[in-house]
Amino acid sequence: VVPPQHLCGAHLVDALYLVCGERGFFYTPKGIVEQCCHKPCNIFDLQNYCN
């Protein structure tokens, strides 16, 4: 299990591509930046943004 991490900018987008794969994701900067850049988030948080 990967520990929660701060993911910002390109790192955040790369992580979403890895987690969501072919499903793709919806990028809502305000929500996900608040959740994953300002605070650490985990893989389950990222999965909430997959399509």
Curated annotation (Swiss-Prot):
Pfam family, one: Insulin
GO molecular function, one term: hormone activity
Domain of life: Eukaryota
One GO cellular component term: extracellular space
GO biological process, one term: glucose metabolic process
Keywords, sorted A to Z: Carbohydrate metabolism, Disulfide bond, Glucose metabolism, Hormone, Secreted
Subunit structure: Heterodimer of a B chain and an A chain linked by two disulfide bonds.
Family per record: Belongs to the insulin family.
Role played: Insulin decreases blood glucose concentration. It increases cell permeability to monosaccharides, amino acids and fatty acids. It accelerates glycolysis, the pentose phosphate cycle, and glycogen synthesis in liver.
Name of this chain's protein: Insulin
Record gene name: ins
